[in-house]
A protein has these predicted regions:
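Basic, polyanion-binding surface patches
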Residues: 1-196
Length: 196
């Protein structure tokens, strides 16, 4: 039986990413985020209104979503815990400025989304940033010979927890194609209708 529980927040599993942006003081900068969703060519991210990233993205209207794997956990944590300072050089992160947005594309992150801000809605201390995805970039070993993404090869880290404790969750290489459970159920139903 389910029961109600009190918590100030609940993160039920969101991929962690390193938000890259131009910075008026430091040239380029990064911070860690986990609040996002994507539909088609749209991406929505959430950042605290008081954060340097919010100010810089409001100014430049562009950013990158650099999605690390677990090999970059130290840098990912550092980028989130240290604020209002230059972090790219401090952590030794190699990057290239995007040709489309000039926001930093981190070499160590296997998947990157290059984004242009469409609008920002600020409410309750959070900037909800709606952006168009201008480009999707992936390491070549994550793409098959037809340029399709190899889902079983990419394992982003997920952020989960509540007001009491927050943790990182890791993916394994199991994948099931969308619709495969319905197909299995139909086959099972077909077999049972033949035998009855």
């Amino acid at each position: 039986m389910k029961q109600s529980f009190e918590t100030s927040k609940l993160y039920y599993g969101f991929p962690i990413f390193i938000l890259g942006y131009q910075d008026q003081t430091h040239g380029y900068n990064v911070t860690t985020c986990s609040s996002s969703y994507s539909l088609g060519d749209w991406l929505v991210i959430g950042v605290g209104s008081e954060e340097n990233a919010a100010d810089q993205i409001k100014h430049y209207q562009k950013f990158t979503v650099n999605i690390p794997d677990e090999s970059l956990m130290l840098e990912m944590e550092q980028a989130g815990f240290i604020s209002h300072r230059e972090k790219i050089a401090k952590f030794g992160l190699d990057f290239q400025p995007s040709k489309l947005t000039q926001a930093p594309i981190l070499d160590a992150c296997p998947v990157v989304l290059d984004c242009q801000v469409d609008r920002i809605i600020e409410e309750d201390g959070i900037c909800h940033i709606f952006a168009k995805i201008l480009d999707r970039l992936a390491e070549s070993d994550l793409l098959d010979d037809r340029g399709h993404f190899k889902n079983d090869r990419f394992a982003p880290t997920y952020f989960m927890g509540d007001g009491y404790k927050r943790v990182y969750r890791y993916l394994d290489d199991r994948v099931d194609p969308m619709g495969s459970f319905i197909k299995k159920a139909r086959k099972k139903d077909d077999k049972s209708s033949i035998t009855t």
